[in-house]
Amino acid sequence: MFRSCLRHCRRATVRSRTCPRCSHHEIPQLQVVQRQISLSSSFPHIRRLQTSSTDTQERIPIRKQLKQEAKAIKSRKRERREQEEASRHKWELTVGVEIHAQLNTETKLFSRAPTSPSELPNTNVALFDLAFPGSQPEFQVATLLPALRAAIALNCDIQPVSRFDRKHYFYQDQPSGYQITQYYEPFARNGYLDLFRHDGIAPEDGDRVRIGIKQIQLEQDTAKSQEYPPSMQLLDFNRVSHPLIEIITMPEIHTPATAAAFVRKVQAILQSCSAVTTGMEAGGLRADINVSVRLRGDGSGTHQYSGIGGLGQRTEIKNLSSFKAVEDAIIAEKNRQIAVLESGGVVEGETRGWTIGSTETRKLRGKEGEVDYRYMPDPDIPPLLIGKDIISALSNTLPAGPDALIDMLVGQYGLAIEDAKPLVELEDGARLEYYQDVVDILRNLQQDLDSKTQAGLGRVAGNWVLHELGGLLSKAGLAWDAERVTAESLAALIDQLQRKRITGATAKKVLAMLFDGDRRPVAQLLEEENLILRPLSREEYIALASAAIELNPQMVEQIRSKNQLGKLGWFVGQMMRMGEKGRVEAQKADAILRELILGLSQ
C-alpha cells in the first residue's frame, strides 16, 4: 500500500523535491508526508509510516560514549566531594566508641567452664551459663588479670572498689534475661589514648590527638546465634559468660578516619599486653559507634553525653567487625543525619545496623535508655576489691606498648616510621622479635667494620625482613614462619652483601633458595654455587677502561683540555656495564681512568 501511494502523486507529495515520476532530479532525502486525508482513517488496520535516508538519532561511537560516561562519573564524584567538604565546614561530627573485647582467659567470668572456642557447640557450658534455677555466679579471679593489664595499658585509674550490675533485656542469646556488667561502678575510669599521624588519624586532626576513655567495665558475652533461613535459628552457648571488657570513650572524636585509627590502635595495645588473643578479624573484638552531628560552632544542642553538652541527637551503630566498617558506617550515618536535618527533619535516637559494602545504615530498633534496661545492682555478687600491690606488680611487668616500640625502633635502630609500624603490628610482635635477632647477629658479625656501616645495619635488616622476606611470604601466600629462613641465615647473607662479596641480585637469589628449603650454611651455599664475587685484577680494570675510552675519544679530549672531570663518571658507568655485574668497583674504576686519561697515579 505504501509503494502504491508513492506511485500516485495525488495520494502523496514529496517535501522539498518534485515527485520521482515527474522529475529526474536526484533526491537526497525522501520523506513521505500525509495529505489532508489521513491514511489511518482510510486504512485503520495500517500504522502510519515514516521513512528517511538518515537515522533519526545520531549514533555515538562506543569509545566516545565510554569517555562521556567516565567524564560524567568523575564529575559526580567531584560534586560529591565538594558537597562533603561544604558539609564538613558547616556541620560538626561527634563520635563515641564502645569496644567489646574478649579477654584472654581459660575460664568464663562467673563459672569454671572453659573458654576454648574450638569445641563443638554447647559443650563448654555450666549450669549458671544457661541460667538453671538455683545456680549461682562464681567470680573467677584469674579473669581480672588481663582486664587490669588492658586498663593499665590504656592509662586508666584502677578503682579500689567496683561492683556488678544487671542489665535487663529479653533476647534469645541471653538465657537469664539480663547481662551482668559494671554500669554504675566500673573497675577502671579516666583513661586516655594518644593517636599520631602514623596511626592513620585524619589530616585535619593534626599530628596528635588525645581521646579520653570514660571507663572500662567487665561484663558477660552472649550466646552465638546462627540463622538458617527461612525460619531456623541455632544457638551456641559456648560463648555465654565469656569474659569481656567494654571500653567506652568520651565523645571527643570528630572524623571517621580517627575513629577507625582509635579502634585499630586499641586492638594493637590489647594484643601487645596479652589481654586478648584475637582481634576483629576473628570476632574477638567488636565495636559499637555513637554518631551525632550539629552545626559547627553551635553549642545550643539539647543533648549531653558523658558530661559534654550541646550535642546533637545520637544514633548507635551496632556490631562493626572491621576497621573499614567503622569508618564507612560513620560516613554513611553522618551523611544521613545531615540530609535529615537539612530537609527540616529530626534525627531520632535509635539503634542502627551496617552491612559491609553498603552505602546506608539501616534502622534496627528504637534506642533503649537507662530506664529501659532497668539497671540494678546484682545481689548475688559481692563487691570487687583491687589492691595497690597487684596494680603495681602488673604495671612493672607490662610489656612495652606500640608507641614505645616504635620510638625504640626509630631511635635505636634507625628505622623510618613507615617500616617501624608494621614491624610492631605484624604477627603480634613475632616479626619484630625476628628482626631484632637478625640485627643482633649482624652486629656481632660486623664488629670489624667501621661505625658508619654498623649504624646502618638496622635499616638494611629492616628492608630484608619486611620487604624481601615478606615479599616471598606474600607471593607464596604463607603465614609468618621464623624457621623458614632462620635469623642466622639472613644475617649471614646480609653480612656477605655488606662486605661486597656478593651482589644484591645474588643475595635475593640465595634468599629464595633458603626460602624454598635449602638448608646449607650461607657461606657453603655461595662457595658451592660459585656465587662469590672475585675481585678484578689491575689488568682487567685497565682493559675495561681502555675499551670505554675508545667509545668516546671526543669526551676524553674535553676532560684533558678543559679539565671536565665530572665526565669521568660516564666512563665509570660504561666500565660497570661492560664488566661482570657487581664486580666493577666505582672507586677503583675512577682511579684507573684518571691514570689513563690524565696520567695521574693514585
Swiss-Prot record:
EC number: 6.3.5.-
Subunit details: Subunit of the heterotrimeric GatCAB amidotransferase (AdT) complex, composed of A, B and C subunits.
Chain's gene name: nempA
Function: Allows the formation of correctly charged Gln-tRNA(Gln) through the transamidation of misacylated Glu-tRNA(Gln) in the mitochondria. The reaction takes place in the presence of glutamine and ATP through an activated gamma-phospho-Glu-tRNA(Gln).
GO molecular function (one): ATP binding
Pfam families: GatB_N, GatB_Yqey
Protein name listed in UniProt: Glutamyl-tRNA(Gln) amidotransferase subunit B, mitochondrial
Transit peptide (residue range): 1-56
Record-stated family: Belongs to the GatB/GatE family. GatB subfamily.
